[in-house]
């Protein structure tokens, strides 16, 4: 994975083996389950693995307390799908406590199998809709970091994800293409949901001409109990 070096990441032989095994399990399961439209090895490495790991630099910047920070950071990946970005981040940062949330139970079952086969410990698996899980006491405002590569409008995605983040924590969505207008439209929703835009890191995915952005949103106050709204509403009627 030459792309990892471009991101400033040095992978051990065992980590490289984990990524290769993950790739093999992904393409094999994809034959019977719709996990990804991308199956060529080089494309999976670039568009899934490297894209997931583009957060590496921001995690380094957020690391305030030395290596111990990783041992206490509780991360949730909302709408994880085939495990991106949660599993790649867990491989590179094995100390992270990672929760993978997805609405499709058969995907969650497969993710458990993947993490077991890869020897990844400290991973939790949750089946359900973000609108419902985000209201449960064991998940609401319990995470230091929420990440998501889910394809959704930033206003809607913020309503799905911000309820999981504790005050002082961060929500970092992965976005593709031009996002300035979308970000401008989402600023009010972000504020309503207790967030404050801290930074936007724009970059080109290594080995491609694909524009990417990491939007860093800090949780500065608790979310009102009225959010998230009932299932479907955040998408049908985004906060404005």
PLM features: residue spans?
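Class I SAM-dependent transferase core
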Residues: 1-70, 76, 106-123
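Short loop/edge segments at beta-strand edges and connector loops
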Residues: 13, 39, 127-129, 199-201
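SAM/dcSAM-binding transferase cores
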Residues: 184-240
């Amino acid at each position: 994975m030459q792309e990892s070096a471009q991101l400033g990441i040095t992978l051990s032989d065992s980590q490289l083996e984990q990524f290769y095994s993950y790739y093999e399990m992904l393409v094999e399961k994809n034959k019977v389950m719709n996990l990804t439209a991308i199956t060529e090895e080089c494309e999976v490495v670039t568009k899934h693995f490297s894209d997931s790991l583009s957060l590496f630099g921001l995690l380094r910047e957020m690391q305030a307390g030395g290596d111990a920070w990783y041992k206490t950071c509780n991360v949730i990946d909302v709408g994880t799908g085939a495990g991106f970005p949660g599993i790649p981040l867990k491989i590179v940062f094995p100390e992270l406590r990672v929760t993978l949330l997805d609405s499709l139970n058969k995907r969650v079952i497969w993710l458990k199998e993947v993490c077991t086969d890869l020897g990844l410990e400290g991973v939790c698996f949750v089946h359900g809709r973000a609108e419902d899980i985000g209201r449960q006491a064991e998940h609401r405002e319990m995470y230091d970091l929420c990440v998501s590569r889910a394809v959704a409008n930033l206003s809607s995605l913020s309503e799905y994800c911000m309820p999981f983040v504790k005050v002082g924590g961060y929500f970092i969505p992965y976005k593709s293409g031009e996002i300035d207008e979308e970000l401008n439209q989402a600023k009010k929703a972000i504020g309503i949901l207790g967030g404050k835009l801290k930074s936007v890191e724009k970059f080109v995915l290594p080995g491609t001409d694909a524009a990417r952005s990491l939007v860093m949103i800090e949780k500065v106050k608790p979310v009102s109990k009225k959010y998230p709204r009932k299932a479907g509403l955040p998408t049908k009627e985004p906060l404005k």
